[in-house]
Amino acid sequence: MKTFQYAKDLGSLKQALAEAQEIKNDRFKYQHLGKNKTLMMVFFNNSLRTRLSTQKAAMNLGMNVIVLDVNAGAWKLETERGVIMDGDKSEHLLEAIPVMGCYCDLIGVRSFAGLSDRDYDYAETVINQFVKYSGRPVFAMESATVHPLQAFADLITISEHTPDWGNGGRRPKVVLSWAPHCRALPQAVPNSFAEWMNAADVDLVVTHPEGYELDPLFVGNARVEYDQMKALEGADFVYAKNWSCPGVTRPEDYGKILCKDMSWTIDAAHMAVTNNGKFMHCLPVRRGLIVTDDVIESPNSLVIPEAANREISATVVIKRMLESLS
């Protein structure tokens, strides 16, 4: 595996889930794969779970790890072509990327959407330059439009809490619900969550106010429901997440906050109409905006198991990439 951005990059999700369970049972089983190999983690944006879980995964596999915070101690990097670099950016990605490739065997990149130019963001300009110019396998630690390590961890978590699914049992009903936020956030997490849930063939419903339609590339055949309470009826899993306007129906609104309706905050009344549903969120979460304290602290909250599974999803991905080197 030379790149990891989308569910299809893993191939069979059933096999990937089995591999995840194998690794969870013995996290150091494949430590030999990373001997004398180096992972470079490049951060253009902040991180807690991604930084810790990915570094731990690489260490589980016996790798050395270099962490580069682009905005803390490194030269400011220019990402656009054809510009006259007479501002505060001293180095271009086109030189920086192959230099990074000289010092490592794998590269993980975290670079959020700017939310000002939809075409630029959805072209995945930054991470695709790493893929093209680094000469190394590259995986997304959240890019402009996707967060596959999170979505894979979410899928692992859901599969662990639906033991009959896949063995002739009922498909779980999973609801991806928009929730309010004080800042404009990218669509990477909901995009990937919808994509991976479709690939796993769950009964997926996406609910949000009008104007927040996600890109059809990720939503696929999932049902879109603008009535949140109706969408939540009988849900086995409720995945809450804010996202800014994706600009699908009105490109001029891309990246904007169109709604601050607090009735979309997930509370006990929302969870009461579910099928004893489990609450999920990628974290970090704004309590009182996305979800109420009683819901996130309830026994049905899976936010910590999700976070723990980030180590497992990253280990599977890095293992696959190390195997591709041999």
Where are these regions (language model features)?
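Phosphate-coordination loops involved in phosphoryl transfer and adenosine-cofactor binding
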Residues: 33-39, 170-173, 276
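Positively charged, low-complexity intrinsically disordered leader regions
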Residues: 1-52, 56
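Glycine-rich phosphate/diphosphate-binding loop of Rossmann-like nucleotide-binding domains
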Residues: 44-66, 159-241, 247
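Rossmann-like adenosine-cofactor binding region
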Residues: 217-294, 300-301
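Short, structured coil segments at secondary-structure junctions
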Residues: 61, 133-134, 200, 220, ...
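Phosphate/diphosphate ligand-binding glycine-rich loop within oxidoreductases
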Residues: 34-40, 47-159, 286
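C-terminal helix-to-coil terminal segments
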Residues: 297-326
